[in-house]
Amino acid sequence: MHVLISQMQELFRVHDGPRIINEKHIEQWSHSYGLNRASLYDAIAELALGFHNGTLDYEFCDAVVNDLVGIHFEEDNSLFWQVFLAFDAGEYGHDGDRGVDPVEKYTRPEITRIVSKLTA
């Protein structure tokens, strides 16, 4: 999936706007990698590994998962949904946490937990 993540990085480098990834990209990647949508989303969710090891930044990862949820996704207990929720938690300050970096307090520990399960 490293090639797919690289393709996404290129999309975000050359395009600007609220939604970079669209339905056409999902269909193209599903066909190219021989994956149904749910499997493709879970494969893309492995970008959590890149965030965890410092090769992908929060803003990129959060933008990717937000774009994907915006296209079409049903809430469930998939790897993708867990990763989405982890990045989503870093988008805003939580009650009683003024001055706390939500990415460090909420996203990073949750991504660490997810990655630990993936690599166990």
Each model region followed by its residue ranges:
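Acidic, Ser/Pro/Thr-rich low-complexity regulatory regions
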Residues: M1-A120
